[in-house]
Amino acid sequence: MNKNEIETQPVTWLEEVSDQNFDEDVFGACSTNTFSLSDYWGNNGAWCTLTHECMAWCK
């Protein structure tokens, strides 16, 4: 693999999320935790879970 191939490889989902600052970009003054994420995605419960927010069949 040469240098150009390394630089042009796609960014993974985890790398993209890790590079973001959710406290300023999405949630303003809120701290980024499971509760604020859960509220942002419309869950009125106490926990942010992939099964509730991201999977339609689990709602």
Curated annotation (Swiss-Prot):
This is Lantibiotic lacticin 3147 A1. There is a cross-link at C30-S31 (Lanthionine (Cys-Ser)). Keywords: Antibiotic, Antimicrobial, Bacteriocin, Lantibiotic, Plasmid, Secreted, Thioether bond. Residues 1-29 form a propeptide. GO terms for molecular function: signaling receptor binding. It holds the Pfam family Lantibiotic_a. Its main location: secreted. The modification 2,3-didehydroalanine (Ser) is found at S36. Lanthionine-containing peptide antibiotic (lantibiotic) active on Gram-positive bacteria. The bactericidal activity of lantibiotics is based on depolarization of energized bacterial cytoplasmic membranes, initiated by the formation of aqueous transmembrane pores. When present individually lacticin 3147 A1 exhibits strong activity towards L.lactis strain AM2, weak activity towards L.lactis strain HP and no activity towards L.lactis strain IFPL359, but when combined with lacticin 3147 A2 it displays strong activity towards all three strains. Maturation of lantibiotics involves the enzymatic conversion of Thr, and Ser into dehydrated AA and the formation of thioether bonds with cysteine. This is followed by membrane translocation and cleavage of the modified precursor. One of its GO terms (biological process) is defense response to Gram-positive bacterium. InterPro entries: Lantibiotic_alpha. There is a cross-link at S38-C48 (Lanthionine (Ser-Cys)). NCBIfam families: plantaricin (NF000539). It comes from Lactococcus lactis subsp. lactis. There is a cross-link at T49-C54, T51-C58 (Beta-methyllanthionine (Thr-Cys)). One of its GO terms (cellular component) is extracellular region. The modification 2,3-didehydrobutyrine is found at T32, T34.
